[in-house]
Amino acid sequence: MAATFFSGFKDEQSALAFLLEQIYEGFQMQSSICVVLKDEKYFDEFKKAQQQKYFEKGKIEYLYDKNISLLDSKPADEFDEIHILSDKVLELPTNVCENVYVYTTKANEGITKASRELYANLKKNNFDLSHQAV
């Protein structure tokens, strides 16, 4: 079980654009992917970012989302990957996923604070943790 924390995004748009780049491989492998977003505004921004990536890259995969579950709370089902840009996930059960990716922005202190608490809880559960400043 591994978790990677990405920090340093100036706003949610830049975090969502990076998140889409990260899950692009999941589209290819048909992985089951969970994306936990803060609220309805973030859901709308995610959909806009998908379309923007499609127009930038010209790859239809950015519009395919049948293997993506969009949630606004802690996931209960098992997934191949979980991507979190939310202040509502403070812990995860060890059986829910092998690969967790957490994104924080300078613009949202609530998400940053929640990710710190999630980091501490995942460490207690023996996740292999890494951090990348973007």
Predicted feature residues:
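Glycine-rich phosphate-binding "P-loop"
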Residues: 1-15
